[in-house]
Amino acid sequence: MGCSASKDTTNSKDGAASKGGKDGKTTADRKVAWERIRCAIPRDKDAESKSRRIELFKQFDTNGTGKLGFREVLDGCYGILKLDEFTTHLPDIVQRAFDKAKDLGNKVKGVGEEDLVEFLEFRLMLCYIYDIFELTVMFDTMDKDGSLLLELQEFKEALPKLKEWGVDITDATTVFNEIDTNGSGVVTFDEFSCWAVTKKLQVCGDPDGEENGANEGN
């Protein structure tokens, strides 16, 4: 699933504000859920995180095939990680993460199943989900008027946060216009998150090594 651009109802800040929360969860709901979730997703490259990732993959892999279909991933995100505490749009986010992991994993390694996520791609998928959630929290702080849309000035003020997060921008106006895919003059969360996650994964997203993978010890 691709990232959607802003449509007619979100081309003005008044239109967006009338819709309430971006996904049915309040900022407070997301902050509470994020404190738990950010520790529950083992996305780092250290040995401990990889060991946790192996165990998590096995829990997701209910069929014991060493490969995950979308339904297994979604069920695991609900039942094991309980990511629905953060968002009501979990199926859409997981679908994007699933597709992105397959695409990047196959591109980097030149191998992989077309419709399945294997262990070497599992970290990429977790990184995507983690980054989307982290960006949601960041967007909450960037969107100072609560309109669910970013203006250029709000984007410029957030450049230090974006650099700390892993995306360094030298020409804010040019980048903002690139993100604003329909030329509305404002940026939706979908536009912002699609751009930011793709940029970050290009820099620091890589598949897990096949050695010591999820099949070890099976």
Curated annotation (Swiss-Prot):
May contribute to the rapid motility of the trypanosomes, playing a role either in flagellar structure or in calcium metabolism. Could alternate between a GDP-bound inactive form to a calcium/GTP-bound active form. It is found in: Cell projection, Cilium, Flagellum. Ca(2+) 3 binds at D180, N182, S184, E191. GO terms for molecular function: calcium ion binding. Belongs to the calflagin family. This is Flagellar calcium-binding protein TB-24. Ca(2+) 2 binds at D143, D145, S147, E154.
